[in-house]
Amino acid sequence: MTHPNELPLSPLSALQFYATAPYPCSYLDGRIARSQVATPSHLINSDVYTDLVKAGFRRSGVFTYRPYCDGCRACVPVRVPVDRFEPNRTQRRVWKKHGELIATVAPLHYDEEHYALYMRYQSARHAGGGMDRDSRDQYEQFLLQSRINSRLVEFREPPREWPEQPERPDAPGILRMISMIDILGDGLSSVYTFFEPGLPHTSFGTYNIYWQIEQARSLKLPYVYLGYWIRESPKMAYKANFHPLEGLIDGAWRVLDPTGLDLPPVDLAIHGKRPPFKP
């Protein structure tokens, strides 16, 4: 269903916006969700997507969406302002701990080793959720299809000596983490990250966000977009540890209280009360 009062202004006037049918929320048990989808996907290039992200949209493959739920606004788009980021003691410790990891930035591409790590991660972290049964095609559609400026970042340990395999002097170090990012006009957008799940107390996810912040700084980009934060979701709690954290509230970006106590009520009938769509 198109919402005329939320049609975009130029240069997005060629896009249309539709609300999906209701479906079970994947973040909060017992809730019903809907999404607003931007179409057609072939018109969403990097410049257009930058404006959409600033308006609270995200992407999954070539599918660009934002939450559009009846009576709920628990999902808050969040971003870190790079120049004002202040790492806490734990984040500095994690940064130092994984300082030897070698990050390689590459175009999106399929690699059997990456897919194997993805499946280990899903089986350990999201068992029974469906993604732990993703086929190669589903993996590629989810993470390797993009119409914008996207990159795959591979994190490996430094190469080691292989005395038992002297024929492999240039063997890469052990793969620890893969991160997909989008390069926007005003920042980096974190798409998805998966890492070796069998290692305790690694905090790879925290290191990855810290790395993205430093990468954005080196590219002179002002923001790192972290997707959605839900105060009631333990899986998303780590995002609130990055300070300052800005959230998109009622159409405007502002600094959030780390506790989330300054957020509007989650249960609120908001259809018909949103501000006009103005990216």
From Swiss-Prot:
Q: Which cysteines are joined by disulfide bonds?
A: none
Q: Which UniProt keywords apply?
A: Acyltransferase, Cytoplasm, Transferase
InterPro entries the record matches: Acyl_CoA_acyltransferase (IPR016181), Asp_Glu_LeuTrfase (IPR017138), N-end_Aminoacyl_Trfase (IPR030700), N-end_Aminoacyl_Trfase_C (IPR007472), N-end_Aminoacyl_Trfase_N (IPR007471)
Q: Where are the transmembrane segments?
A: none
The EC number(s) attached to this protein equal 2.3.2.29
Where's it mainly located? cytoplasm
Q: Where in the cell is it found?
A: Cytoplasm
MF (Gene Ontology): arginyl-tRNA--protein transferase activity; leucyl-tRNA--protein transferase activity
Give me the reactions it catalyses: N-terminal L-glutamyl-[protein] + L-leucyl-tRNA(Leu) = N-terminal L-leucyl-L-glutamyl-[protein] + tRNA(Leu) + H(+); N-terminal L-aspartyl-[protein] + L-leucyl-tRNA(Leu) = N-terminal L-leucyl-L-aspartyl-[protein] + tRNA(Leu) + H(+)
Biological process, per Gene Ontology: ubiquitin-dependent protein catabolic process via the N-end rule pathway
UniProt KW Cell membrane keyword: no
One Gene Ontology cellular component term attached to this UniProt record is: cytoplasm
Please give the HAMAP family that the UniProt record associates with this protein. Answer: Bpt
This molecule's function is given as: Functions in the N-end rule pathway of protein degradation where it conjugates Leu from its aminoacyl-tRNA to the N-termini of proteins containing an N-terminal aspartate or glutamate.
What family does the database annotate? Belongs to the R-transferase family. Bpt subfamily.
Return the protein name: Aspartate/glutamate leucyltransferase
